[in-house]
Amino acid sequence: MNGTEGPNFYVPFSNKTGVVRSPFEYPQYYLAEPWQFSMLAAYMFLLIVLGFPINFLTLYVTVQHKNVRTPLNYILLNLAVANHFMVFGGFTTTLYTSLHGYFVFGSTGCNLEGFFATLGGEIALWSLVVLAIERYVVVCKPMSNFRFGENHAIMGVAFTWVMALACAAPPLVGWSRYIPEGMQCSCGIDYYTLKPEVNNESFVIYMFVVHFTIPMTIIFFCYGQLVFTVKEAAAQQQESATTQKAEKEVTRMVIIMVIAFLICWVPYASVAFYIFTHQGSDFGPILMTLPAFFAKSSAIYNPVIYIMMNKQFRNCMLTTICCGKNPFGEEEGSTTASKTETSQVAPA
């Protein structure tokens, strides 16, 4: 084995020379240079500085402006709440531990950090799934005479929490476990060992199928159908400049959102899958740390894509930031008239 396994950790470094120490008790500077740990801390600080304001502003704007408190926007608020879990439950902890070079909060702290970081990430993931389904239902109308309302929006939000808990809670009660990962300064699900005592293999398979493959399939299907429907409508109304513009905006939105999803989750899932299917193979701590950067960065770019590209939200944010005056001269409700045509389809 090219790593060292302890009772509640796995360090991706052979202990042939006897230098490996518990990531809960000693700095892990044999895994990476001290400056690399400092860079990790700096990156976490950047995520906090950028991630907290934009997500907090989303919630604040919703309280201040009634016209954005619509059922179709509930899931966007849920996304902002999920990102706060990631900021406070994961980023702040990793910032502190990176400055010390090891996970100073012990095994219990690892469980808590792993749980909240996973919970926030999974709520965000399933929020994107629900958002795709909602847009598919509203635009493509697979069910005739169906009207999307507040109860449906609340059910969608509740669904994201149920699915997130179904992923984040089992490691706390004996199905898999949370251990330090990468440079041993943050905690996540154990992809490194089979650990039959906690049925780790079955949980990892469950994770890849239910919490990666299925969400990705749903998102690709819904947005594929959405683009097809909008293009078909545009072809039937070629003389309408508004319809043509909406088609281009929707297509652009779908491309951006699919790419964002892939950037966020594919690197992390791919590396985790490789590590799990190549038990004992030689890999450095950076291999798992870098993909985690992409996943954690979603707390910044997901709000930008899904919220700030929403014209209603954007106008209200500008009005709030500029003390009640939109510098671009657009009124908060300027998109209300076209809401059924574009704002429910695309956040552009």
From Swiss-Prot:
- A single GO CC term, please? photoreceptor disc membrane
Q: Where is this site: Plays an important role in the conformation switch to the active conformation?
A: E113
Sequence positions bearing Phosphothreonine:
T335, T336, T340, T342
Residues bearing a lipid moiety (S-palmitoyl cysteine): C322, C323
State if Nucleotidyltransferase is listed as a keyword: no
Glycosylation sites recorded in the entry for this protein:
N2, N15
Please indicate the ranges of residues that lie on the Cytoplasmic side: 62-73, 134-152, 225-252, 309-348
Q: Where are the transmembrane segments?
A: 37-61, 74-96, 111-133, 153-173, 203-224, 253-274, 287-308
Q: What keywords are annotated for this sequence in UniProt?
A: Acetylation, Cell projection, Chromophore, Disulfide bond, G-protein coupled receptor, Glycoprotein, Lipoprotein, Membrane, Metal-binding, Palmitate, Phosphoprotein, Photoreceptor protein, Receptor, Retinal protein, Sensory transduction, Transducer, Transmembrane, Transmembrane helix, Vision, Zinc
Pfam families attached here?
7tm_1 (PF00001), Rhodopsin_N (PF10413)
Q: Which residues point to the Extracellular side?
A: 1-36, 97-110, 174-202, 275-286
Q: How does it sit in the membrane?
A: Multi-pass membrane protein
Give the primary localization class: membrane
* Chain's role: Photoreceptor required for image-forming vision at low light intensity. Required for photoreceptor cell viability after birth. Light-induced isomerization of 11-cis to all-trans retinal triggers a conformational change that activates signaling via G-proteins. Subsequent receptor phosphorylation mediates displacement of the bound G-protein alpha subunit by the arrestin SAG and terminates signaling.
Please give the name of this protein: Rhodopsin
Gene name, please?
A: RHO
